[in-house]
């Protein structure tokens, strides 16, 4: 039996179980299928039913680059593929330099080097440029409100109106896609310093490392896009949140990398568990980094494979010659340093490594909504 002999409902049911990257390749093969892939009803069904194909992306030299990590014990390695090019808005067509990026449900929220922001679906090649009152000390997060209609995507803007890069945040705004406008969040105040510039998106909310303004202890700060409020959560015992980094494991758990200080070669990996609606931390594994000398690399972005007990980490170092990716595993089963080959100009920004799951989520004028 040919696909053309099947009913449209059955074809839709079959295709809704195909990953987004495969559907992208099918768009040009059939006009009917291409129209189906643009149908919001099909997009919602496919998002919920299709298996999630995770890609590793790295923000490198102002571009988002796919990265393949070979985690074999005998010869671990890293391979970079061609960059995913973000184009300027029409009628311009030049590539845009990306300064920061965060992601949620296959959408990337990017800040450009000229202080513009754009929501980008690399799988579909769609973009939505967002107008905002520019302030270079703003930070952004992408998440979604959960209600009976599904997921309604929003952008949070945190702004230090004193124009000081101290992490002190005073004002908060929400961007709504449906109205293409920003609104101020009233009665929202923080009594902590946000330590990590880029938040981690997890199940629609955004998480940052932070420290209490008065007592200086470390904490996990969560912004709930449904209630539009901040919540404090606990962290594992540690000396300094500036020596920590956050990540997500398989879309199911938060992960924390903890280093005690710049001279310690001991690195701990923690993961979250939810027990009776309370977030709890458990230690996953510990690594004694086999590095020579007194200085241990400051690892600011990473991905972890819980099954293999291995992490792929990036060190924050603005000296071009010292930029490296590390593959580090439990009991020193893995250890590889991979220098990054970059151009001659100095790279300033917030390099990150993250898991990205391509999706058909559309950036619509009426707002981005996924029905649960």
From Swiss-Prot:
Q: Which residue pairs form cystines in this protein?
A: none
SMART domains linked to this entry: FBOX
Q: Where are the Kelch repeats?
A: 155-204, 245-293, 324-372
**Does the UniProt entry include the keyword Isomerase?**
no
> What SUPFAM superfamilies does the annotation carry?
F-box domain, Galactose oxidase, central domain
**Which InterPro entries does the record cross-reference, listed alphabetically?**
F-box-assoc_dom_typ1 (IPR006527), F-box-assoc_interact_dom (IPR017451), F-box-like_dom_sf (IPR036047), F-box_dom (IPR001810), Gal_Oxase/kelch_b-propeller (IPR011043), SCF_F-box_component (IPR050796)
Q: Which UniProt keywords apply?
A: Kelch repeat, Repeat
Q: What is this protein called?
A: Putative F-box/kelch-repeat protein At3g22730
Which species?
Arabidopsis thaliana
């Amino acid at each position: 039996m040919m696909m053309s002999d099947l009913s449209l409902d059955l074809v839709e049911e079959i295709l809704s179980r195909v990953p987004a990257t495969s559907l992208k390749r099918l768009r040009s093969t059939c006009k009917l299928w291409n129209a189906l892939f643009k149908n919001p009803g099909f997009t919602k069904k496919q998002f919920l039913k299709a298996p999630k194909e995770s890609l590793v992306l790295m923000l490198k030299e102002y571009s988002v680059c796919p990265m393949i990590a070979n985690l074999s014990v005998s010869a671990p390695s890293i391979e970079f593929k061609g960059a995913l090019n973000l184009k300027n808005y029409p009628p311009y067509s030049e590539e845009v330099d990306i300064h920061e990026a965060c992601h949620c449900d296959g959408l990337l929220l990017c800040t450009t080097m000229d202080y513009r922001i754009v929501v980008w679906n690399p799988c579909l090649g769609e973009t939505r440029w967002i107008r905002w009152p520019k302030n270079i000390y703003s930070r952004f997060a992408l998440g979604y409100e959960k209600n009976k209609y599904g997921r309604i995507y929003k952008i949070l803007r945190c702004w230090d109106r004193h124009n000081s890069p101290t992490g002190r945040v005073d004002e908060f705004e929400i961007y709504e896609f449906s109205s293409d406008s920003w609104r101020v969040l009233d009665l929202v105040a923080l009594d902590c310093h946000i330590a990590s510039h880029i938040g981690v998106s997890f199940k629609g909310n955004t998480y940052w490392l932070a420290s209490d303004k008065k007592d200086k202890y470390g904490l996990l700060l969560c912004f709930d896009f449904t209630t539009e409020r901040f919540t404090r959560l606990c962290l594992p015992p540690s000396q300094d949140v500036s020596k920590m980094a956050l990540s997500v494991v398989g879309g199911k758990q938060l992960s924390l990398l903890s280093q005690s200080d710049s001279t310690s070669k001991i690195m701990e990996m923690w993961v979250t568990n939810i027990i009776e609606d309370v977030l709890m931390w458990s230690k996953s594994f510990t690594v004694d980094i086999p590095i020579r000398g007194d200085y241990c690399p400051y690892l600011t972005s990473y991905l972890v494979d819980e099954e293999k007990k291995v992490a792929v980490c990036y060190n924050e170092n603005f000296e071009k010659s010292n930029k490296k990716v590390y593959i580090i595993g439990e009991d020193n089963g893995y250890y590889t340093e991979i220098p990054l080959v970059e151009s001659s100009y100095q790279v300033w920004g917030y390099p990150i490594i993250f898991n990205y799951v391509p999706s058909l989520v559309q950036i619509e004028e009426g707002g981005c909504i996924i029905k649960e």
